[in-house]
Swiss-Prot record:
It comes from Paenarthrobacter nicotinovorans (Arthrobacter nicotinovorans). The gene is ndhS. Gene3D superfamilies: 3.10.20.30, [2Fe-2S]-binding domain. Keywords: 2Fe-2S, Alkaloid metabolism, Cytoplasm, Iron, Iron-sulfur, Metal-binding, Oxidoreductase, Plasmid. One of its GO terms (biological process) is nicotine catabolic process. This is Nicotine 6-hydroxylase small subunit.
């Protein structure tokens, strides 16, 4: 593997979890690798690295995207949220709903599901079961069978935006 030359680096101005920063990134580096390795945001998981499993899902300007398929340079001028942004020390209402419904087992896929669910609930605070299933259809889980994940997302809407309850 060859080491990138300085000319292969691109300076970007990006907001990550509410904090704006200017950083130099390898022009070929994925956003997932940049966030995990340079920003130390390891909630992002790399599963398939082909955009199929959803474990690397983040929100970019409010839309769920696969960070393994997105170049870090594409983050220039954008607002990015990762699973680390969902709570401020205590579990978020959505995370509490996942806990209440036992919507995770090994946990590898959980961050991706949480980010996809966050996109849905911020756009549609009272989704139907069918809308939840559709919103989560790009995320794979080998452990739960999905039912408890759907139940958790359906249970969370009344609590979104209310960290106390």
């Amino acid at each position: 593997m060859t080491t990138p030359s300085p000319s292969d680096r691109v300076e970007i101005d990006v907001e990550v979890n509410g904090r704006r920063r200017t950083v130099a990134v390898d022009a070929r580096e994925t956003l997932a690798d940049h966030l995990r390795n340079d920003q130390k945001l390891t909630g992002i998981k790399l599963g398939c690295e082909h955009g199929v499993c959803g474990a690397c899902t983040i929100l970019m300007d409010g839309a769920a995207v696969r960070s393994c398929l997105t170049l870090a340079a594409q983050g220039d001028g954008r607002s990015i949220r990762t699973v680390e942004d969902l709570s401020d020390g205590a579990l978020s209402p959505l995370q509490e709903a996942f806990k209440r419904h036992h919507a995770l087992q090994c946990g590898f896929c959980t961050a991706g599901f949480l980010m996809s669910a966050t996109e849905l609930l911020e756009a549609n605070p009272s989704p139907t079961k069918e809308e939840v299933i559709e919103a989560l259809s790009g995320n794979l889980c080998r452990c739960t069978g999905y039912q408890t994940i759907v139940e958790a997302v359906l249970d969370a809407p009344g609590q979104i935006g209310n960290k106390n309850g």
